[in-house]
Amino acid sequence: MADDTFITTAFANIGLSGDYGTSWFLTRLIGPSRALELMLTASRITAKECLDLGIVNTITPYEEVRNRARQLALDIANGPRTALRYMKENINRAVNSDLKTCLSGEARALMQCSRTDDHKEAVRAFMEKRPPIFNNPR
C-alpha cells in the first residue's frame, strides 16, 4: 500500500450496507468489533493504521509502489511453481478446515513437491551454497 493512501468503507455515508464481501473479508482480517467500527463510522484508515490492523502487509513510498509490485510479482513468478501452488491451496484449505484435514493436505502436497525437479534443484543449490534456479518456462 502506498504510504500516502487511505481506505474507507464509506457505506454508512451513502446509506448502503456494504457489498463485494466487505463484511466477510473485514471480519476475518481484523475481527468483528473493529470491522463493525469501520463499517459504522466510515472513517478513513491511513496506510499506517492498515498495517497495524493487518489489512495490508507492507507500506511503500508512493514513488516506489510500481517497482515494488513488479519485483514482488517477479520474485513469486521465479519461485518453484508446484510448491507455490500447493502453498496457496494449503492456506486456502486452512481457512475453513480442521487441523487434521490441513495436516493431511500438507502431507500430500509435500510428497508431491518432493518429487519435482524444483525440489531437486533446491537441494543441489543448498548443498552448493547458491540460490536455486527454478525451471519456470514463460
Regions found by a protein language model. Name each.
Residues 98-102, 136:
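Short beta-strand->loop
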Residues 13-16, 94-98:
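Glycine- (often His-adjacent) and acidic-residue-rich active-site loop
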Residues 93-94, 129-133:
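A short structural micro-motif
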